Amino acid sequence: MGNARSKAMPIVLCGKAEVVGKQVLEGLKPDIEVILFCQGSDPTAAEVPYILRGVAPPTQSSYIGSGVYTRPPKAVIMGAAWDANAVAQVKAAIQSAGLPAGTAPIILRNDTSVVTPKPPAREYGEQLIHRIRLVLGKLERGEKLDGPEEGVVV
């Protein structure tokens, strides 16, 4: 079991509804490990720098996730409720962590130009699982990620 976890890609998942977060977390296993599900841009901006340093945030907006902070996330993925300002806030928090060049996680935001069922519908979560797997597969293979704007690819 520990071996499967060590091979799973660690990520931080951000969204509005824990019911969707739980569904997506379970649907991404065993290849992708959700370290923590964060709710809201303010909490995420506060929590991610701790996660990047390998420690649990002192306060958490959610307790969904593996809680294993020993491997930094490869990506911070935000759901449909996140706008460009929220992305910028989290990006600034990541930059403030003072990571070595090239080690910061990629920030991905849901492409709202893609028609989806409305959250928290189960179908929304299923589509999100599929889209996250596709994008993270590209990332793992070193392929270029592209979307309608920077960071919007999921």
Which residues does each predicted region cover?
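Long terminal accessory regions outside catalytic cores
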Residues: L28, I64-P72, A84-N85, A92, ...
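Intrinsically disordered, low-complexity domain-flanking/linker segments in eukaryotic proteins
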Residues: R53-P72, A101-I107
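Ser/Thr/Gly-rich flexible loops in soluble cytosolic domains mediating phosphotransfer, phosphorylation
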Residues: A93-L145
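Structured beta-strand/turn binding interfaces of compact recognition modules in eukaryotic regulators
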Residues: C14-K16, G79, N110
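Eukaryotic N-terminal low-complexity, Ser/Thr- and Lys/Arg-rich leader segments
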Residues: M1-M9, A101, E143-V154
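Mid-chain, well-packed structural core segment of small domains
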Residues: R71-I106
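Extreme N-terminal segments of fungal proteins
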Residues: M1-S61
